[in-house]
Amino acid sequence: MQIIFCRFIDAYKEQGIPIDMVMYQNEAYSYTPYPGCAWTATGTIRFNKEYLAPTLRQMHPEVKLYLGTFNTNRQDHVETILADTALCNCIRGMGFQWEGREILPSIRKQHPEWEYICSESECGWGSFDWKAAEHTFELINHYLGNGCCEYNFGIVFDR
């Protein structure tokens, strides 16, 4: 699977789109009724430390590895992952979204040397009304106020 990451990096580069950072999975902690790929702490550590990080280091040393996206507020789960010092030595940052925003401040205190991003805005049902705008403003304020250097939007289209 880690080779697939590198193939995507290569394919994007061929199209003139440089990739400078990857995360192993979007919403890796969603336990959904539809097919998904939820991760355990042990699986997260093993895949990133033993497979993805070494492969990126060898094939794309210019690409940073971030943990995430953390869409969970289970601090105990994230602490288990961060307790692996060998893994932490491979990481340059973390991505948070949804409930993950609740643990961002405490994680950032533990690892002030890393970069942090909001990997996906909460677009909800795509109402784009004033209430949704206020909610998004509060999210942007929270993420940037807690040290995130990037805020990414998710947009719902009607077609």
Functional labels for PLM-detected ranges:
Residues 1-128, 134-135:
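Active-site neighborhood of glycoside hydrolase catalytic domains
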Residues 118-159:
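Aromatic/acidic polysaccharide-binding cleft in carbohydrate-active enzymes
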